[in-house]
Amino acid sequence: GPVLNPEDAQILERMLRTARSVTVRERSSLAWCRERGIDARLSVDDATDYPVASPARTLHYAEGVSAGQALDELPEHYVCVTVNECTDQQAQQIARLLDGMWREHGYAPVFLSHYGDPQDPASGDIQAHQRIAKRLRTSTPATLLPILHADQSIAVHRAAAFTLTSRYHPAVFSAAAGIPVLALVPDAFTQMRVGGALRQYGLGEFTLPLGMLAGGVPELMVAAALRHAAVASDARRTELLEVLRAERAYLLTQILASGAEKLDEVEAPAPFPTVEQVPALPEPLGATVRAARELFTETSLTAGFEWAMSDRAHSWDAEHRRQLECARAIGGYSAHGAEQTRPVTVEAYSEAPAEAHPAQPGLLARVARRLRG
């Protein structure tokens, strides 16, 4: 998701209907399931209470790359930054925001990659981080970290004073630890996931499309997030951890139960507790940003759907060409050097019966037929 063409939606629905238990991470997914009569429950991401090993596990890096020294020298107060993509203009705007956080709050930017290759230090999020870092003022100290093992990554997030991210799990780790978060959203997919995760904590308003970095809005949202974190208790976080543990216990009971009668005896967890959302901006600015966010999400979904349909068409076209080439290769040449002509049938994604042909249908065509029952 969130882009599902009709065929994909049918496949997903069949998958969920065959599951013994369905749990989702955000209310948009819950609504999708309930619209189709699927008995789903809402919970939090299973990395919310990720247990860090002791000693923390590490990755195997390419020669000359070491994360240990940088981790030992992290600043006392810092904003943890994870950005996976941005334009040059957005990189400049993010750098300006980070300069302001250093100047006003004393938070030094620490760039933490969540995607990359430990054997290729120039790959992944580090590329966007380098572009942002080189636009910082010379007076703003910055630390660039490579991709880390989850044990180390979570430790960095939990020790931060603030999190600025366009990725999902940095928001999950930080919100679970009570660290204020501002999510910079590049598309509808991220908005649904990150916004859904933050909404569980009452922080769903702290998401901002990357195209809205100008005009002082992100600075206001950072200030609001810090004010809320200064007075917030850990009651909601404790409540969500209890929800997650109850969900796991319920799933385990279902797995161990055998037979319909025993399954009926398993008591489902209590409904997911609701929470009031914390305002991120004063009104009417907050309403304006919400409307812009909704329009951005709708536009991104439309573009994503069109891309998905185009990608699907190209995929089937490539598969048809492959089958045609295989069929021609099977035809081959006769022993006398003359090409043997054989009827060729290309399997299509259609209910129409194929012409009589001794060859077996292509793999994708067989899968499609199986899914259609």
Where are these regions (language model features)?
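Active-site anion-handling motifs in enzyme catalytic cores
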Residues: 1-347, 364-367, 371
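Acidic, proline-/serine-/threonine-rich low-complexity intrinsically disordered repeat tracts
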Residues: 342-360
